[in-house]
Amino acid sequence: MGILSITDQPPLVQAIFSRDVEEVRSLLSQKENINVLDQERRTPLHAAAYVGDVPILQLLLMSGANVNAKDTLWLTPLHRAAASRNEKVLGLLLAHSADVNARDKLWQTPLHVAAANRATKCAEALAPLLSSLNVADRSGRSALHHAVHSGHLETVNLLLNKGASLNVCDKKERQPLHWAAFLGHLEVLKLLVARGADLGCKDRKGYGLLHTAAASGQIEVVKYLLRMGAEIDEPNAFGNTALHIACYLGQDAVAIELVNAGANVNQPNDKGFTPLHVAAVSTNGALCLELLVNNGADVNYQSKEGKSPLHMAAIHGRFTRSQILIQNGSEIDCADKFGNTPLHVAARYGHELLISTLMTNGADTARRGIHDMFPLHLAVLFGFSDCCRKLLSSGQLYSIVSSLSNEHVLSAGFDINTPDNLGRTCLHAAASGGNVECLNLLLSSGADLRRRDKFGRTPLHYAAANGSYQCAVTLVTAGAGVNEADCKGCSPLHYAAASDTYRRAEPHTPSSHDAEEDEPLKESRRKEAFFCLEFLLDNGADPSLRDRQGYTAVHYAAAYGNRQNLELLLEMSFNCLEDVESTIPVSPLHLAAYNGHCEALKTLAETLVNLDVRDHKGRTALFLATERGSTECVEVLTAHGASALIKERKRKWTPLHAAAASGHTDSLHLLIDSGERADITDVMDAYGQTPLMLAIMNGHVDCVHLLLEKGSTADAADLRGRTALHRGAVTGCEDCLAALLDHDAFVLCRDFKGRTPIHLASACGHTAVLRTLLQAALSTDPLDAGVDYSGYSPMHWASYTGHEDCLELLLEHSPFSYLEGNPFTPLHCAVINNQDSTTEMLLGALGAKIVNSRDAKGRTPLHAAAFADNVSGLRMLLQHQAEVNATDHTGRTALMTAAENGQTAAVEFLLYRGKADLTVLDENKNTALHLACSKGHEKCALMILAETQDLGLINATNSALQMPLHIAARNGLASVVQALLSHGATVLAVDEEGHTPALACAPNKDVADCLALILSTMKPFPPKDAVSPFSFSLLKNCSIAAAKTVGGCGALPHGASCPYSQERPGAIGLDGCYSE
């Protein structure tokens, strides 16, 4: 918002600023637009409110000026009046219904503005009209916050008298007290405290009043707070006390006051830093550091990372502070948890003067730090030659003459070739750092240029990886081998070819926010890397050398997109064509395409004759570029004749399939426009899928439109007969579906199971898609039955999957379709899959028409619900008059179905709520009790027994003359046998094999016969013909005891699952599998 010229304003505004009432009246009589807007949407009324001329304002208001007009900042004339502190203008605006709750873009009301601008009279006029004085602006501040911020005692007092809350917090949980303390408004602070404000309040980050006052150096506020009993060592959320804050910001006067008041000079924060650490590192903390040292601060206190105050001073090279610390006993060689001493830190950040001080005071230059590095490692790694020289001059043992110059260099008192824990010497670090002066100093001091690290790399490998031309020249001139391979088989040439990737970042170079400023530096580095590669090639580096994976330098240059490096390698290599075309392990063309390096790819494409070489998976470079979505690479390859129809080996996808599946529309467009084949859009993969099908499966609408516009066949089917429309129905993409229908896709196409897209949309619950398909189907073939090859309709599928919206739509569309197709009705489908919502909808819509319907085997929905143990389904069916004792073609009721399948909940419901008949017999004369026992379902059998005392039911025999006791005994159901015996089951009844229930326990017929012979010899009872009615009655009454005797006999096994007699057709368990 700039300053506008008054001459550019409308005449009415000019007259207002001139305070010319008559001119204003004249302009208004001439029908001048009273609500005319300037560039910032301010009206003449805004101007009048700002100027504060009451007569003009009154004239404008009487002439119909908009009293609540808002400018671009949403400020109203009332805001302007409050800002100008003109209570008369404000009162006039209020009298003309100005909105007292109007908010600007910062959500500030006129009261906020009045409080911020010390407009006490305006605030007094506004306060009674507001429901609350604590309304917050966008930052959460109330009018009291603004009044305190302005430091106007009268306004603060007024707001408090009118009921403003003392402890209201902004979005950072700062109270008005925080602002009074921070800005040094002592009288305001005292007033707030006198009114009951909490001196111990903290904001969201735990800053108290003492912290805020210390931060801004408000010494008088600090003294007042200390007098009022403020906790002097109270930490904030980061563990910092007020003394930490004062030392960090260089507020030495506050620090003195705090120390004199007894602040703990050694209290650590959450990271273990004391105020002395903070003073040592801060910009303006020199006086604070001296104060702390003189008041007993521990100069050797270590943080959680082991850093002492001397470490902190070394980071920024605080020379004077370091001297003070050393003079007061700071340990010179104190190591942090990484092993770094202050000398390591000073070397890392290039503070030569501090290094001199530390060395003068006995710092150990041979001390190992991070990764077992010397300080010299760090100095040369980060390119500080002066520090390197200083460290080399320490502990002089002998003097040698440099081979490169006549300069005498003093050798260090440690072995310069000592490696770190990764085997890297100082020369490796210098080569990586790229400072040739450091490199020369080390070489002249006897550094071994052939020394290898643990990865087998020489210093030349590191120089090449960082593209350092001067270092490479120095090392090669000194005798470094240009073709030496590391553990991966890589020569320096491999790393030089990819030097932009391996180049070490420059941590001491500040990063620029402007990419244009970085570009010259990047270009300079690219040139240097190119010169480095060129130098290596000129000095015997072999471009045909392969690493252990089979990659040459050409592969590396292609993989990392260094076009100039690649061109140079191709030019210098005698067998470059063989390297480029080799696909073992992967060709350079594939590497460039995969990584999206179009410039490198273009270079290779211009060199190669065949661009359709394939990798071990059968993928071409064009396939990889398309799959990765690199449009520029696709454009390069297609322009040079790469084929879009070559298929990879696994799924037989072409680049078109890859583009469509990934949604790369631009790449797909380029592939189609290559014009390789007229039907290129209909090429199929191993499963018969076209690119159109894959685009729809993945919801890529743009690709779908493009393929259809380019002639893709909408009705093409895969090997299972499924078209793009089938896939659209499954994914539910309405836009894709609409595009297909616009291109005349056949809506009633069927797959290999006879299912149409309508079936799939119903099964997947896509209501909008289903509606569209049903409308299209009406116009295609309104008489189509709409059932698949198994006789199932879309209504069956919607019911089975529980999509009630789809079912509702289908019922509206064709209410009698439930009669079509498979007699296993939609209601059967809903209850067998526990879909309560669709069950309820079908019963509500069709009721008696469907509730007792039967499938091909005579089973009702009640049978299906019982089979699935669907109690809620059973309840709803019975509420709609389902026949509880209805039998299927085998004579079984729903209860018998539940009992046979062990569905305990269903059995319980049908017995207790449904009152199902237990005496119903199936075609083999089995009761529900027989069936429960035959499948070993103890709980179901016991439930049935708990509901009956009928001896006829308990001793009922099926067509094989077996009682429930025979079957329970055969299956080892001890608890059921006991219950049967307690209910009076006879133990002497024989089945058609002549076996009693006791003999039914035998594992097979032969064992049963043997057991019968033994028992007959033992003769525990009178012969059969001699048994009197009395003795039979006695046996019956003693059946429990008899059962216990048999059960306790170890000779008779329990739980045997094999029947002792051959199963007869139609005996127990027939049709036991309830499947459709």
Curated annotation (Swiss-Prot):
<keyword id="KW-0677">Repeat</keyword>
<feature type="repeat" description="ANK 23">
    <location>
        <begin position="790"/>
        <end position="819"/>
    </location>
</feature>
<feature type="repeat" description="ANK 7">
    <location>
        <begin position="205"/>
        <end position="234"/>
    </location>
</feature>
<dbReference type="Pfam" id="PF12796">
    <property type="entry name" value="Ank_2"/>
</dbReference>
<feature type="repeat" description="ANK 13">
    <location>
        <begin position="422"/>
        <end position="451"/>
    </location>
</feature>
<feature type="repeat" description="ANK 15">
    <location>
        <begin position="488"/>
        <end position="545"/>
    </location>
</feature>
<feature type="repeat" description="ANK 17">
    <location>
        <begin position="584"/>
        <end position="613"/>
    </location>
</feature>
<feature type="repeat" description="ANK 16">
    <location>
        <begin position="549"/>
        <end position="579"/>
    </location>
</feature>
<feature type="repeat" description="ANK 18">
    <location>
        <begin position="617"/>
        <end position="646"/>
    </location>
</feature>
<dbReference type="Pfam" id="PF13637">
    <property type="entry name" value="Ank_4"/>
</dbReference>
<feature type="repeat" description="ANK 12">
    <location>
        <begin position="371"/>
        <end position="400"/>
    </location>
</feature>
<dbReference type="InterPro" id="IPR036770">
    <property type="entry name" value="Ankyrin_rpt-contain_sf"/>
</dbReference>
<feature type="repeat" description="ANK 21">
    <location>
        <begin position="720"/>
        <end position="749"/>
    </location>
</feature>
<feature type="modified residue" description="Phosphoserine">
    <location>
        <position position="1028"/>
    </location>
</feature>
<feature type="repeat" description="ANK 11">
    <location>
        <begin position="338"/>
        <end position="367"/>
    </location>
</feature>
<feature type="repeat" description="ANK 27">
    <location>
        <begin position="924"/>
        <end position="953"/>
    </location>
</feature>
<feature type="repeat" description="ANK 5">
    <location>
        <begin position="139"/>
        <end position="168"/>
    </location>
</feature>
<feature type="repeat" description="ANK 20">
    <location>
        <begin position="687"/>
        <end position="716"/>
    </location>
</feature>
<comment type="subunit">
    <text>Protein phosphatase 6 (PP6) holoenzyme is proposed to be a heterotrimeric complex formed by the catalytic subunit, a SAPS domain-containing subunit (PP6R) and an ankyrin repeat-domain containing regulatory subunit (ARS). Interacts with PPP6R1.</text>
</comment>
<comment type="function">
    <text>Putative regulatory subunit of protein phosphatase 6 (PP6) that may be involved in the recognition of phosphoprotein substrates.</text>
</comment>
<dbReference type="InterPro" id="IPR050889">
    <property type="entry name" value="Dendritic_Spine_Reg/Scaffold"/>
</dbReference>
<dbReference type="Pfam" id="PF00023">
    <property type="entry name" value="Ank"/>
</dbReference>
<feature type="repeat" description="ANK 22">
    <location>
        <begin position="753"/>
        <end position="782"/>
    </location>
</feature>
<feature type="compositionally biased region" description="Basic and acidic residues">
    <location>
        <begin position="502"/>
        <end position="514"/>
    </location>
</feature>
<feature type="repeat" description="ANK 9">
    <location>
        <begin position="271"/>
        <end position="301"/>
    </location>
</feature>
<feature type="repeat" description="ANK 1">
    <location>
        <begin position="7"/>
        <end position="36"/>
    </location>
</feature>
<feature type="modified residue" description="Phosphoserine">
    <location>
        <position position="1075"/>
    </location>
</feature>
<protein>
    <recommendedName>
        <fullName>Serine/threonine-protein phosphatase 6 regulatory ankyrin repeat subunit C</fullName>
    </recommendedName>
</protein>
<feature type="repeat" description="ANK 10">
    <location>
        <begin position="305"/>
        <end position="334"/>
    </location>
</feature>
<feature type="repeat" description="ANK 14">
    <location>
        <begin position="455"/>
        <end position="484"/>
    </location>
</feature>
<feature type="region of interest" description="Disordered">
    <location>
        <begin position="502"/>
        <end position="522"/>
    </location>
</feature>
<feature type="repeat" description="ANK 8">
    <location>
        <begin position="238"/>
        <end position="267"/>
    </location>
</feature>
<feature type="repeat" description="ANK 28">
    <location>
        <begin position="960"/>
        <end position="989"/>
    </location>
</feature>
<feature type="repeat" description="ANK 2">
    <location>
        <begin position="40"/>
        <end position="69"/>
    </location>
</feature>
<feature type="repeat" description="ANK 24">
    <location>
        <begin position="822"/>
        <end position="852"/>
    </location>
</feature>
<feature type="repeat" description="ANK 25">
    <location>
        <begin position="857"/>
        <end position="886"/>
    </location>
</feature>
<keyword id="KW-0597">Phosphoprotein</keyword>
<feature type="repeat" description="ANK 3">
    <location>
        <begin position="73"/>
        <end position="102"/>
    </location>
</feature>
<feature type="repeat" description="ANK 6">
    <location>
        <begin position="172"/>
        <end position="201"/>
    </location>
</feature>
<feature type="repeat" description="ANK 4">
    <location>
        <begin position="106"/>
        <end position="135"/>
    </location>
</feature>
<feature type="repeat" description="ANK 19">
    <location>
        <begin position="651"/>
        <end position="680"/>
    </location>
</feature>
<keyword id="KW-0040">ANK repeat</keyword>
